[in-house]
């Protein structure tokens, strides 16, 4: 079973969109196995965005993700990364398809509602940044046998 990390960013928390974002992921058949409201400190933000260090927008990324509370979650399911990425839509909401989270809810490329890991390696790394293993809960929903076989 594949797992991936999602972050409902400060803009979405401030706009009251957390429930809508989580609902859309659950409706795609994904199961939340970890979920928490938190403030990201600068050290974690730097580790999370390490690949962007040195880029012109790096400091803005850090300032934004540490500017207010976020909701961090781990979802699992077959092809969880692919399904999450398609449900999110393109990074730039102006290019995201209607019906995607970003296409419907995001305002700008800098305030685009949600982050999702883009590979199994990144998912594993990012999950480890935000969750201890004992914070992840495996369980079966009644509907899982219909979705996951």
UniProtKB/Swiss-Prot annotation:
Subcellular location(s) per record: Cytoplasm
Kindly name one Pfam family recorded for this protein. NDK
Give the matching CDD domains: NDPk_I (cd04413)
| Cofactor requirement | Mg(2+)
Mind telling me which residue stretches traverse the membrane in this protein?
Answer: none
GO MF terms listed in the record are: ATP binding; metal ion binding; nucleoside diphosphate kinase activity
State the active site: 115 (pros-phosphohistidine intermediate)
Supply one GO BP term: CTP biosynthetic process
Give me the reactions it catalyses: a 2'-deoxyribonucleoside 5'-diphosphate + ATP = a 2'-deoxyribonucleoside 5'-triphosphate + ADP; a ribonucleoside 5'-diphosphate + ATP = a ribonucleoside 5'-triphosphate + ADP
Asked if the Swiss-Prot or TrEMBL record annotates the protein with the keyword NADP, the reply is no
Q: Which residues bind ATP?
A: 9, 57, 85, 91, 102, 112
SMART domains reported in the protein's UniProt record: NDK
- This entry's Enzyme Commission designation comes to 2.7.4.6
List the GO cellular component terms: cytoplasm
Q: Which InterPro entries match?
A: NDK-like_dom, NDK-like_dom_sf, Nucleoside_diP_kinase, Nucleoside_diP_kinase_AS
Q: Which UniProt keywords apply?
A: ATP-binding, Cytoplasm, Kinase, Magnesium, Metal-binding, Nucleotide metabolism, Nucleotide-binding, Phosphoprotein, Transferase
Entry similarity comment: Belongs to the NDK family.
Q: What does this protein do?
A: Major role in the synthesis of nucleoside triphosphates other than ATP. The ATP gamma phosphate is transferred to the NDP beta phosphate via a ping-pong mechanism, using a phosphorylated active-site intermediate.
Per UniProt, subunit arrangement is: Homotetramer.
Report the protein name in the record.
Nucleoside diphosphate kinase
Which gene carries the instructions for this protein?
A: ndk
């Amino acid at each position: 079973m594949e797992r991936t990390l999602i972050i409902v960013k400060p803009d979405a928390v401030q706009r009251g969109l957390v429930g809508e974002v989580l609902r859309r992921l659950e409706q795609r058949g994904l199961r939340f196995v970890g979920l928490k409201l938190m403030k990201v400190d600068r050290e974690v933000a730097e580790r999370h965005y390490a690949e962007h260090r040195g880029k012109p927008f790096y400091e803005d990324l850090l300032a934004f993700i540490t500017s207010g509370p976020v909701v961090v979650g781990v979802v699992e399911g077959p092809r969880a990364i692919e399904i999450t990425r398609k449900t999110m839509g393109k990074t730039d909401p102006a290019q995201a398809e209607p019906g995607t989270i970003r296409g419907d809810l995001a305002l700008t490329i800098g305030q685009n509602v949600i982050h999702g890991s883009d590979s199994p390696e990144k998912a594993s790394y990012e999950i480890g940044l935000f969750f201890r293993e004992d914070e992840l809960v495996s369980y079966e929903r009644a509907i899982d046998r219909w979705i996951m076989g």
